[in-house]
Design a protein with these regions (language model features):
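ATP-dependent helicase/translocase motor core
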Residues: 1-189
């Protein structure tokens, strides 16, 4: 489904397969049979959804917090495109800040910052969130992210079941997508 960058140039066939990967964006992506709602941008690799984005602009009076509200309250997590592990990450992107989550669960969805620092530095050539477009969303880096950083961890929690009158292990999966500062540290090492 996806061919990652070869570790060496010794296998020309693998090189050719890697070059055939297609990272595409879809603007105003309609996702439901029940309404006409759309997501500002969907990113796919070889037709597989990997990232969804709500894009907000201060010139229209909106910021990344408006995108977060949209994900929490206007996007039904039961829609097939939003089911857990269907996408790797959901971004809310403004001119000044970026937030992300890996699981939509309605109003309880937890977003984390995906910024360079507490405040993104001023960019004399454009938006403060340029790093998302200029660095992170480059095709080779997206593939590197998927291959080396994104993973699923199974967590086990002890819960008491009153019907059975005993403590049980409750397992749940957590999709790990690194935040910007984590990626930045690894890249600098």
């Amino acid at each position: 489904l996806v061919y990652f960058q070869p570790k060496s140039g010794l296998n020309p066939e693998h090189q050719e397969l890697f070059k055939k990967n297609r990272l595409i964006t879809v603007r105003q992506l309609k996702y439901s049979k029940h309404n006409e709602n759309s997501i500002d941008m969907g990113i796919f690799i070889n037709g597989i959804p990997i990232m969804m984005m709500e894009l907000k602009n201060t010139l229209t009076g909106q910021d990344h917090n408006d995108g977060i509200r949209q994900w929490k309250f206007d996007r039904d997590p039961k829609e097939p495109l939003f089911k857990f592990k269907r996408n790797l990450v959901y971004f809310s992107v403004g001119n000044e800040k970026v937030s992300m989550t890996t699981r939509l669960i309605g109003s309880k969805t937890r977003f984390l910052p995906f910024n360079k620092d507490i405040e993104n530095p001023v960019n004399k050539r454009g938006h403060k969130t340029h790093y998302l477009w200029d660095d992170i969303l480059q095709p080779n880096f997206v593939l590197d992210l998927i291959e080396n950083y994104v993973h699923i961890r199974t967590e086990t929690e002890k819960v008491y079941d009153p019907q059975r009158e005993k403590v049980l292990d409750k397992k749940s999966d957590v999709l790990i997508f690194p935040r910007y500062h984590q990626l930045n540290v690894i890249r600098r090492l």
